[in-house]
């Protein structure tokens, strides 16, 4: 259930000696606006070490195909504003060209990024499904159910999964308002009951669309999923 370790480009140098000789799968992450040279330097620092780079996460830019590390599976953070639709369409084009590229939306607030409410997240999910692309979500998914935590609102992992399933099911007649209602649901019993109806095929199609989520402490959502008897208990 836990994928590669997400490492900021600025922190690769600190991780190398800690890894020792034990292979560690990592994804190098850089915030939008980080110079490509800094990302390249971080990747260069992993050469000959135990760090196995599985991909890079950067802000979307029109020339991402020409970046020196574009051969690494890239995850492109989608901006707000005028470039949003262009960026999502570009990810679709990249996937159709054979690139292992995905979109990313930041679901948690930062000093420079206002928290995306359920309507904004619903629009992202709708557009991703309509374009037929894969996405990951990062930041803010510390709990399985929508709620107020640490002084502010946070989206829930189960809410997101159920919303993605609904978007796929209703792909011929997309209803962003309905997805927003799902994303605002705060009753874990309602969400858990919905997920329990999924068979393997339905689960796989959700996972093909929502490939991953980034979280500071993965034990929180996993523990909460176990408490709802949706996964085996985590040690």
Walk through the language-model features, giving the residues of each.
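Expand to "…catalyze enediolate/carbanion chemistry for C-C bond making/breaking, isomerization
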Residues: 1-235
């Amino acid at each position: 259930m836990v994928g590669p370790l997400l490492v900021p480009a600025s922190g690769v140098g600190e991780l190398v000696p800690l890894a020792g000789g034990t292979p560690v799968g990592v994804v190098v992450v850089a915030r939008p606006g980080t110079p490509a040279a800094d990302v390249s330097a971080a990747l260069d620092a992993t050469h000959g070490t135990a760090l196995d780079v599985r991909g890079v996460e950067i802000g979307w830019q029109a020339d991402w195909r020409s970046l020196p590390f574009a051969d690494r599976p890239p995850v492109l953070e989608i901006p707000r504003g005028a470039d949003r639709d262009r960026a999502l369409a570009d990810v679709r084009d990249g996937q159709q060209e054979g690139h292992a590229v995905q979109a990313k939306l930041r679901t948690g607030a930062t000093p420079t990024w206002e928290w995306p409410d359920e309507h904004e997240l619903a629009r992202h999910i709708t557009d991703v499904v309509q374009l037929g692309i894969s996405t990951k979500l990062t930041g803010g998914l510390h709990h399985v159910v929508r709620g107020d935590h640490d002084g502010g609102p946070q989206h829930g992992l189960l809410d997101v999964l159920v919303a993605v399933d609904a978007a796929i099911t209703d792909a011929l007649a997309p209803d962003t308002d309905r997805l927003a209602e799902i994303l605002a649901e705060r009753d874990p019993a309602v969400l858990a009951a919905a997920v329990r109806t999924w068979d393997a095929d339905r689960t796989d199609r959700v996972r093909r669309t929502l490939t991953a989520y980034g979280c500071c402490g993965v034990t929180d959502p996993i523990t909460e999923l176990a408490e709802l008897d949706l996964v085996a208990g985590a040690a």
